[in-house]
Amino acid sequence: MNLEKFIPNKTALITLIAASLVVIISLGIRQTFGLFFFDFEIDLGCTQTEFGFAMGIQLFFWGLFGPLFGLITDKFSGRVAVFIGFLFYLAGIYFLNYGPNTGFWFTFDLGILIGIGLAATAISIPISIVSKHFPLNKRTIAIGVVTAAGSFGYFVSPIYTRFFLLEFGWNPTLLIFGAMILAGLVISLFLNTPMTETKQQNENTQTAMQAIKEAFSNKSYNYLTLGFFVCGWHIALVAT
């Protein structure tokens, strides 16, 4: 494929690269938490049940806050949504490292804060930002690039995380994660919204409740949502 024909403009290219880096950081870190379990068990007294519960809560808040960050994206911009998401993500990593991080607070840090962060930084919001920069005949490929970046994050992050854990321990590894998320905060500033899309947002008078009613009146949307509890939730827990 001719790259010049695929990329509409410089802004689209920058946004595509930024979105890809965002999901590499976000999904990559998320995929490594299972490697920390034995350290959490020894140093924090975390049981398998507590760890599994925290990860389940993380998935729940990931899904619960997705529509809210979608609303923020429509109302303000995807850049704002992802930036806020990385702040929650960073807070979760910070408290997981420095405390409070035992008992309820373990679930709060790993489950709630990081779950909220994932709702904005994982795959949905970055894909929606990128798709607005590309015409329909090229949009699928652009989305595929971002999705592939997320898969790359899944693949490579357990490798370097295992190395860091063996060489430095879990606390320094979480510090490295914090530095990566700080980089993600900077990268999120390069997620641009097309001017035409901004004008359409300003002209859109649909309220959040109207959008929710419209979504739940669509059978396909309801089936897709129910399907998550069969596939997405279980697969994510198994992968962890």
Describe every region a protein language model picked out.
Residues 103-121, 229:
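Hydrophobic core of transmembrane alpha-helices in multi-pass small-molecule transporters
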Residues 40, 120-134:
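Intracellular juxtamembrane helix-capping segments at the cytosolic ends
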Residues 14-48, 66-69, 238-240:
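Extracytoplasmic
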Residues 56-71:
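Central cavity-lining transmembrane alpha-helices of secondary-active solute carriers
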Residues 192-211:
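Flexible cytoplasmic inter-helical loops of multi-pass small-molecule transporters
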Residues 146-196:
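Helix-loop-helix hairpin linking two adjacent transmembrane segments in secondary transporters
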Residues 87-101:
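C-terminal ends and interior cores of transmembrane alpha-helices
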Residues 33-37, 219-240:
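Extracytoplasmic gate region of multi-pass secondary transporters
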